[in-house]
Each structure stands twice: as structure tokens, then as C-alpha cells.
Amino acid sequence: MIGLTQLNVWIDVVFTLLYGVIVIALCGHFLGNILTGRAKRRFVGWEWPHHEGGPIPAAPKLMHFQHVVAMIALAISGMYIRFPFYNGGRSVMRWVHYVAMVIVIGNLAVRLWYAFSSRRRDYREFAITKRDIITAPKVILYYIFVKPSKPHLGKYNVMQKSTYIIFVPLLIIQAITGLALLTYPVPFTQTVTYFGHAGVTGRDVIVGLWAGSLLGSTDLAGWYARTIHYVVNWLFIVLTTIHVYLSVTEDFPAFLDFFGLSFIEKKEEEDHHVELGHSEVPATASSDHA
């Protein structure tokens, strides 16, 4: 069987090349925005998609902000653990990684509760409907500059919904495999003798109890857990890069609003209409909204 180190090298090579291709493609896409005039209409004319529904509540914004900060911490600490560029920092980075992991897991649990069980449950906003599937080709044609506008049926189009839906199982997989790699004892278990040592670790529970038995070897289970965790880490880097790019270039006001910076968007819109000689700011109606 191929060794873990050798496999990690191949994963690094494949995803580094893939990431480079994606960055070049996004640069080309932005050039297309400039050549077609979309960038000027948006960032100069401040014409952006109009969203159906009310403003985004404070709770999802807070959870989104916490998630972003924790995911950045996970990415940086995870890459350092894989590529330690200075000596002596691995222990600190592991703790940063574990703390950020706990925040992401807790945040995901609360967000799922909010989506399905809270008074303001919003899971329907992310559900892919029959109309979404029908309009999906038009959305894709818009993104590749074949169509000048895209259908926008609600707060999110079908591609956005698909991305958010994919994030949930990926986060769950990353949480399980991350806990399987956890070798520090769970708090308050230091007095328990488990698998021949003091304290219960995530690796003991996930790899030692069931994954190892399922695969016939705890070493093999740990090997799979580490490999899957690393691949999903790269998938998050790729998907998040695309997500951030499209958030900024396709709906910058919503991007600002999610981080509590909507006052910048309002200032830009007011300045734009003052330049046009309007005394009032009408509701935004984008030329990209079909």
C-alpha cells in the first residue's frame, strides 16, 4: 500500500495544480466582467442584484462571521501542521486547530438548529426547487457570459444553494475525521484509564472503538481518517476561494452586509445617485436581474 507521506505529496501536487488552474480561471472570468461591462455597472454604477425577502437577521450574520474566522484559523493552522515553516510552533498550532474545530462544530450545530427549529427557521431559502433545476442552465450560461442576465428566484440561486448544501456534509466529514486525529484527552476524562492510557481521546473513540474494528486495523482506520481529512481541507480551500470571488464580484452589497459593513454599501449608493442628480435613492434594480 502507498505510504501516507507519499500519498500526501501526490495530494499536494494535484490540488496545488488544480488550485492554480482555478485562480487563473477566476482571473479570466473577472477579465470577462471588465470586457462585458459588468464590472463597471456594478462597482462604478453600483447596480447589483435585487434580493427578494427581508434583510438578513443578526443571528445568521454572527454565525457566518464566527465560521469565517474559525475556518481561516483552521486553514492556516492546518497548513502549518502539514508544512511547518518554522520550528517550535506545531504544539501551539495544534491547539489553535483544535479550538477552531470546536467553534466550527458548535457553530454548525447551532446553525442547523436555527435553520430547522428556530422561530426564524430559514431552511426553505436553501432548498433546491423544481424551478431552480429548470433555471440552472440559464444561471450557468450567465456566468460564462453567454446570457446578459440570470434568473434570481429568491435570496440565492441554484449554484449558491448547491454550494451551501455541499458545505454541510463536508463539515460533518471534516469534524469526524478531525476528532479521529485528536490525541489530546477530552476535558474531565484525565482520571479515566482508556486504551491503556489516562484520558479519553477522539482517536480512541472513533478509530479505536468502531472505525478500527470496521476496517480490521486501527492503523488503517487512522490512515484513512488523515487522508480524507486532508483531501476535504483542500476541497474547502478550493470551494471557499470560488465562493469569496463570486460573493464579491456578483453581489458585493450582500458580502458587506454579512460582515456588518452595509453602511459602506449605502454610502456608495447614495453618492452614486447624488452624482446623477437624484435627491432620493430608489430601490436597487439590477440589470443582471431577470
Question: How should each PLM-predicted stretch be described?
Answer:
Residues 1-290:
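Membrane-embedded alpha-helical bundles that constitute the cytochrome b-like, heme-associated redox core
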